[in-house]
Amino acid sequence: RRKEAGEIAEKYADFVVITELDPGMEDINKICGEILSYIDHKEKAEIITDRDTAVYTALKKAEGMENCVLVLAGGSDAYMKRGNKVYPSDTDGERVQKFLKKICK
């Protein structure tokens, strides 16, 4: 899936923020770096390992522009798997709503 994510981002996105999603026992930077390796134009991508910061950054970059922001893969999951632990987390929808309220004040 990482190769496909990078290739699709390269083909269709003007800008992409690569972030964590249930890294489990893998290093987050390694996962994000692997996705980035499939994006030829590195200037149109940024790695932000914290998902909250990544979503907020993507929304801020789109502010005041005619853009569409896609927040993919997390969906309605209200948890994040890191190592062998599961942590409570906002869903992607909750994240977007929270940050849009902040940005659109």
Residue ranges of predicted features:
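ATP-dependent carboxylate-amine ligase
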Residues: 1-105
